[in-house]
Amino acid sequence: MAAERLDPWGAVEIKDYDRLLRTFGIRPFSEVLPLLRKAGMEPSFLMRRGIIFGHRDFDKILEAKARGERVAVLTGFMPSGKFHFGHKLTVDQLIYLQKNGFKVFVAIADAEAFAVRRIGREEAVRIAVEEYIANMIALGLDPKDTEFYFQTNRGTPYFRLIQLFSGKVTAAEMEAIYGELTPAKMMASLTQAADILHVQLDEYGGYRHVVVPVGADQDPHLRLTRDLADRMAGVVELERPASTYHKLQPGLDGRKMSSSRPDSTIFLTDPPEVARNKLFRALTGGRATAEEQRRLGGVPEVCSVYHMDLYHLMPDDGEVKHIYTSCRLGKILCGECKQIAWEKLERFLAEHQSRLEKAKTIAWKLVEPPRF
């Protein structure tokens, strides 16, 4: 974390999550686990395993829910590439919260895709609908209780917030949070703040208790948004949003997972033979020889195949613990471990892709694409 900053647009690799908690004032998620049950919610395996490791004010959201007040969750996706397992990690959290009574809002960051990534408008719309929205529906997000929207189509009150926010923060303050910024990134940051806060307006449902689940690298946007909510007092009353933070799933090459490096991730639309080849070439924590691994054991902490099990393929805690222990004790070799993961991945992809074409048809009916 150079100069104690996180870059939400860059290839951030975070090694020390405890330091991140200390540096940026994020609270450990473990402290809200008892409150989940009071709110009638069983912790998900992502929560139990510490993959969701931190929060800001999520305890207040749970207390509001326990009082019977309306709660919502909002996230956004920039349509700049194919939908991969890193994206699925966020959607799994949306599905969990939706099943527990949260209204879901999903922003399609088409303005940011154009300004920051230079994605053509028509291409951004196609990617948004056929890759992101369709995959979310196929994963199990209920479209009847989800509001999808394009940033550039959202309406006057939303854009009014962006304009007013621009008068509540200086360029120097934004650079202290983000580092050097282009005009496009400044605009994208203010727009993301509007995404997070606008659902509190009556025109968009008046949801005062909102949580935003993000990867740890996205925290700068939350810090800016919380400051802006405070500074809008006297203009429009906005509550600080809550947030939860998940660890970034390593790519198959050990670096940050990215659509721009196709071999670093498995896309949810990959044909079986492509997905299998990627998985079997993935970085592992194995030793140089089978004999050495049996003697010394493997290192699952740096194994991208184990991370696929941990984050996605093995919701049963006992099963994933067995894989971890067997690797550590040298009782299982990498080839066998990959085969176990592949059998689960193959089944998941087959079932998911069988739902995808129908989901695409539904997805096009859910949103109004921007005219230009």
UniProtKB/Swiss-Prot annotation:
Lineage of producing organism: Archaea, Thermoproteota, Thermoprotei, Desulfurococcales, Desulfurococcaceae
Motif ('KMSKS' region): 256-260
Biased composition (Polar residues): 257-267
Record field: catalytic activity: tRNA(Trp) + L-tryptophan + ATP = L-tryptophyl-tRNA(Trp) + AMP + diphosphate + H(+)
Keywords recorded for this protein, A-Z: Aminoacyl-tRNA synthetase, ATP-binding, Cytoplasm, Ligase, Nucleotide-binding, Protein biosynthesis
Chief subcellular location: cytoplasm
Organism of provenance: Aeropyrum pernix (strain ATCC 700893 / DSM 11879 / JCM 9820 / NBRC 100138 / K1)
Family of the protein in this entry: Belongs to the class-I aminoacyl-tRNA synthetase family.
Protein's name according to its UniProt entry: Tryptophan--tRNA ligase
Segments for region (Disordered): 247-268
The keyword Transferase is assigned to this record: no
Record localization: Cytoplasm
A GO term, aspect molecular function: ATP binding
